[in-house]
Structures are given as C-alpha cells and as structure tokens.
Amino acid sequence: MNNLEIFEESKKYMPGGVNSPVRCFKEMGMNPPVIKSGKGVIIRDEDGKEYIDFVLAWGPLLLGHCDEDVVKAIKETSENALAFGAPTKLELELSKFMCENLDNVEMIRMVNSGTEATMSAVKLARGYTGKSKIVKFAGCYHGHFDGFLIEAGSGVLTEGIPGSLGVPKESVENTLIGLYNDKVQIKELFKKYGNEIAAVIIEPVAGNMGVIKANEDFIKELRDLCDEYGALLIFDEVMTGFRVAFKGAQTLFDIKPDLITYAKIMGGGLPCGAYAGKKEIMEKLSPCGGVYQAGTMSGNPIVMAAGLATLTKLKNNTEFYDNVEKMGKKLQDGLIKISEENNLPLIVNRVGGMLTLFFTELEKVNTYEDVKTCDNERFKRYFKHMLNEGFNIAPSQFEAMFLSVKHTEEHIDKFLDAFKRFAINEK
C-alpha cells in the first residue's frame, strides 16, 4: 500500500485518519506522508521518499531517530520487563538522575505524557495552596486537559478554534487568561483575583504559538506576584526541558519555579512525562499527602530505560548543545539573509535548537497578538514547497522547527537552498 491508500483506509478506522489532529494536514489542504522508518535526521514514507526531518516527533528526538544507545537500552530492558505496575530500580535511577542534575528538582513523579504532567501539577498546586483558580497565557498550550483549552495555541490556534466542544463552562471557570509578556495585564489579574489563584503555569519559551521567549522582567513579575499572593509558579518545560539547554529554559532566567513539568526528550521517543519540584510541595501527593494521582503505566521500565539512556548521553556530551546552537544560528542567519535579499517579510525567532518562521510585516514577534498577524496563506505555500523539496516541517505556522544533534551543515545548506527557491517564487 502507498501513502494515499494507507491514509484513505485509516480514515475508516480513526477519526480523520490520525490519532492527533495536526497530523492529518487538513489545514494545509493535502494528505500527509505516511512514515515508515527513520534514522538520524532522515525519515522515509511508504512511497519510498526521503525527508530531512525538522519535526523530530514534535521535539523528543534531540538525539535523532533510533539513536543506537537508546535502542540498545530499550532492547535490553524489554528482554526482562514490559510492565509490572510495581516499583523498579529503573524508575529510581531516572528519578535520582533528574533530581541530582536539574535545578529546583527535589522530588519527582513520573507520568505518561505532557498533558498528564501539567494537569497533575495544577491539581497538586490546588491541593497545596487550598485555592482553585489558575492562570495560563493566551497562545500557550499545556495539553488537552479541559481547564487548559482556552486560547490554547498549537493545533487549536492552527484551526482557528477558540476552545473545544465537550468542555463545559464549569471546567474552565477557574482558568484565568493572562497575556504573554504583558506585565500590566498580569498585575491587574492578580489585583482582582490574587487571593483565589493557586498557580500560574507558563511556557518560559512558548513553542505552540511559534517560538517566543518570555521577557526576563515578565518572568520576574510572575515570581514576585506568586510570592506576594501565595500562588505557585509552574514552568511547563515539556518542550524546552533538555532542549534549549540540558537543564532547560530555567537556565535562561534567574528565577526559581515551584513546580516544573517535563516530557518529550526525557522519554527518548517513548511516551513519558513527569512533574517535579520542592519536596515540601511534592509530598502533598498520595501516598504521602492527600492529592491523589496514579497511573498504571507510570514509571514503565522500558520508558525509564530509554529516558535514562537519552539523558545520560546528553549529560556526557555537552558539545551536543554547542553544535545544535551552531546549526540553529546558521539556519536562522541564512533564512533572514535570503528573506532580505528577496524582500520577503519574515521574522525568525529562535532559542537554541527550536525556531519558528513568522511570515509577517512586523519588526518583531513577542506576543500572542503579534503571532495572529502572520500570513497563514504564505505559510501554506512555504510548507507545500518544502515538503515537495524533501523537508519534513510542522504543518502549522504556530509550531516550532526542531534541530537534533545529527543535523549537519550539509542539511542546513540544503534547507536554505530550497527556501531560497521558495523566496524567489514569492516575488
């Protein structure tokens, strides 16, 4: 069966033919390639076409596809363990590794996804503070938990949906919407609701309205407000953890969060998530405290092995991050140069190995309102052009591109050559 045949048959058994909406390429007006295999930065579809991958499973594969050490760990572990639903040495080893090597992580709880991590962190914050309201920011995506699906960015923003059907108003009445990088608005929000706010959750580097780094004075304001009103500050590092730096986006700010959520890279390509923070807070979780959260597959031994292999390799090879930064800068500089030479309105935001192309006339993109000015029709033309040229990029103006340690100057040069042809065609 070829790509089209597989995808058409998939529609008979899965809504839209996919298990996550953005994969269907609906907004791009085309069918997606059906991926068969991947190694390094190269993926192959069922038609045999190869692509240089800048999606990397939506971020987890910093080491590239099927890294030999990660695959070895999975194979060796699977000979003796699939799942137990019981304590294992592997979950101790990964938990200890993260507590000893990350900032502001005294205790950790393993879960199975980023959504589980963020929803559980919010529940814990509510249980710890005894308060109900949370603040999230327009354009930030924290998973498909009901209380987060307001102004959520990601696929919700791509499809122009304000939220989601099936979410009753009661589920979101305790969710307050902040404006990213707007100190005045967040002060007013706390002035009105501060004594009811349990937590503020934020992507310190947003990745689901495109890549936007929070201003340092804005993050400091959040910390100060949380301290003043007795709320917890939660950093959602599902995307940025181990990516923008080994210790995550925390290293970009001189600010300590109370709780941090992780996923993606920490699972080495397998389903994984975690939330972590101060011992005093984490011990409110059952069985120590009264905040109940559980999971049959949490701490799964194969996932723990993949995660430990991934994070150990990243820690022991710090030059990986230098190379990703070098490739990211080369790509960013090249895109800007080509756009200027061809009078193509473009802003390229980048933090480490994640970046976004914003097709806009603005001089900078720093807020959710800025993002909404982007030319989505031009993005669609860009997307189709690059896919045809053999590059796998996210089918959304509002998602990040990701680099891995396996991307080379040759890969970047090929991407820039293809982008130049697009820019010339846009004249």
Swiss-Prot record:
A GO BP annotation: protoporphyrinogen IX biosynthetic process
Principal location listed in the UniProt entry: cytoplasm
Location of N6-(pyridoxal phosphate)lysine modifications: 264
Biological pathway: Porphyrin-containing compound metabolism; protoporphyrin-IX biosynthesis; 5-aminolevulinate from L-glutamyl-tRNA(Glu): step 2/2
Signal peptide coordinates: none
Essential cofactor(s): pyridoxal 5'-phosphate
Keyword check for Isomerase: yes
Pfam families: Aminotran_3
Name of the molecule in the record: Glutamate-1-semialdehyde 2,1-aminomutase
